[in-house]
Amino acid sequence: MDPGVLRDDMVDSLEHESKGCVQSATVGGAMRTVPREAFVEEERGAYADRAFERLGTRVLAPSTAARLFEALAPEEGDSVLVVGAGVGYTAAVLAEVVGERNVHAVDITRRLVVEARGNLADAGYEGVLVDRRDGADGLPEYAPYDRILLEAAALSPPAALVDQLADDGRLVMPQGAGEQTLVVVEGDEVVERLGGVAFQPMLVEGEQADTVERNRTRREDREFARRNAEAGAGWEQDWIDWDGA
């Protein structure tokens, strides 16, 4: 079946009042244009409203991606940073709106960076910049950004990303650990809460899927101890091996 017809059917379903995920002509038009099958290696299945697993990451379901795009509200000419490039699909949709050379994407996993670059080039978006970085550090070389999309959950907006926002910029992210909420951040404050979501947690160096040792527990121990250092109770010495940290 013609992929263009499948794309139209997909967006039609997302625009229908039963879902209501796509609300703007801008987002709808971009999603009707990007060949999703180029990013998930399926043709018909690519347009089903479900997520895919690929190289240790989750390719977002179209309805979830649409919610992110609508929350981000990109405009033509905006400079955009995508944290969590994945396979490149969201970067491609944003490139349709703002222009491919205005989209910058980072991912901590090297093989996903390679995958995203290849997918984007094959789909006609070779102007999108994709780099391997710790997402929490952002991409300061190209800051400030009018829009930042964080495709991984965190308890609070990473300070470096907030610093890289333009004065009137907008950051969209899943906030929370167990229960997550899609939020819009302007400045350093949450200005909108847009309902529940379920994303993978944000990773730092050493936690990506192709790393032998994972360091989340040790990192969280250090952060927890640092946040509570003023308590002065000495509790941290009982359960953290500081010499080995």
Name each region found by the language model.
Residues C21-Q23, R36-F69, A73:
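Conserved SAM-binding loop and adjacent beta-strand
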Residues P74-V183, G187-D188:
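Conserved nucleotide-cofactor-binding alpha/beta core module
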Residues G29, A66-E70, A92:
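N-terminal, well-ordered alpha-helical segments
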Residues M1-L6, V172-A245:
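SAM/dcSAM-binding transferase cores
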Residues M1-E42, R218:
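N-terminal auxiliary segments of SAM/dcSAM-dependent transferases
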